[in-house]
Amino acid sequence: MSEYSLFTSESVSEGHPDKIADQVSDAILDAILAEDPEARVACETLVKTGMVLVAGEVRTNAWVDIEEIARGVIREIGYNSSDMGFDWESCAVMNAIGKQSADIAVGVDEAGEHEQGAGDQGLMFGFATNETDVLMPAPITYAHRLVQRQAEVRKNGTLDFLRPDAKSQVTFRYDENGKPCAIDAVVLSTQHSASVKQADLREAVMEEIIKPVLPAEWLSKETKYFINPTGQFIIGGPVGDCGLTGRKIIVDTYGGMARHGGGAFSGKDPSKVDRSAAYAGRYVAKNIVAAGLADKCEIQISYAIGVAEPTSISINTFGTGKVSDAVISQLVREHFELRPAGLIKMLDLKRPIYLPTAAYGHFGREGENFTWEKTDKADALRKAAGL
């Protein structure tokens, strides 16, 4: 038997408590950016039974109705009945947003000859791999697609007994060349109404969610399926668990296959390099892989608060590079702008584009607003590398 290794990633649905919080934070960010593209926003959300608490720091002259925004997000997700214990109409919405410190603005804002500095110190990673069509790791890609499908069949009425809270997990087998060759295990847990029998639920999830999403060539008689393995899952959402912004940073990125600098994304305007530089890192890594310079690429970028130039840029292609990592690193410096103001302009980030990122991953997504997914630098990189 040939040698193989296993790798697992998980995702959660838009109705998971932590993801509700992420979406509320990003909806508020979008509403502010729509009125004031120069706003500074750091918006955190907590959700629990019957309540939403929004807190953080904002600097803007714009006014937005935070209560209305939060209720709208919860309604769209599908918490629309008091039977679920969480309802967009009856939940309390509390606002504890304050002003951003003027000390931060001194180092971060552009003023005359002073170039915009990083909003904080920190390290960020970007990653890409050619094992899927979206140049993302297979486990996180299919984990996301499972919970996206759960939301789709819940909302369109195909499986009307499903409720918003759900989680998925996919374990892939990788061959001796490091390529995905089979799916070893699939876990899908979904909240549901009390009326459905477990046997009916499991059959419906298998036929309407798992089979349409996972490629048949990766499934076999050896694939293990765990559908609601603990039995019934009636109590869920913010009733079952408290939700907080920024607690699903591995779901948001690469499913654990790449390293993470620790900074969350949602609720942060693009002056925060936690978010914008991680997006730029993805853009760099994806273009390197799309150009054929490597099968797999991870970039680390780091910053000092108030300083524009990155304190470091490093590249790792895990031995898959067609040219050396040092050559790729030099190409990155020549072809990409990684100072805060430059990368914000490069990716056009001062726009209300963030709510769609707050569920089902920030990377490997399609749509013109996911500017960091473009591969428009691939040809220039390929030519510059002499490939």
From Swiss-Prot:
Q: Which gene encodes it?
A: metK
Entries under CDD domains matching the protein: S-AdoMet_synt (cd18079)
Q: A GO term (biological process) for this protein?
A: one-carbon metabolic process
Q: Where does ATP bind?
A: H16, D165, A166, K167, D241, R247, K248, A264, K268
User: Which species?
Assistant: Marinomonas sp. (strain MWYL1)
Residues that hold K(+) according to the record: E44
Query: Pfam families per the record?
Result: S-AdoMet_synt_C (PF02773), S-AdoMet_synt_M (PF02772), S-AdoMet_synt_N (PF00438)
Where along this sequence does the record place binding of L-methionine? E57, Q100, D241, K272
Catalytic activity, as annotated: L-methionine + ATP + H2O = S-adenosyl-L-methionine + phosphate + diphosphate
Where in or outside the cell it occurs: the entry states:
Cytoplasm
EC number(s) reported in the record: 2.5.1.6
Provide the cofactor note recorded for this chain's UniProt entry. Binds 2 divalent ions per subunit. Binds 1 potassium ion per subunit.
This protein's pathway: Amino-acid biosynthesis; S-adenosyl-L-methionine biosynthesis; S-adenosyl-L-methionine from L-methionine: step 1/1
Residues reported to bind Mg(2+): D18
The protein here is known as S-adenosylmethionine synthase
- The superkingdom listed in its UniProt entry is Bacteria
Q: Which PROSITE patterns does the protein's record reference?
A: ADOMET_SYNTHASE_1 (PS00376), ADOMET_SYNTHASE_2 (PS00377)
> Which stretches of sequence are listed as region Flexible loop?
100-110
Subunit info here reads: Homotetramer; dimer of dimers.
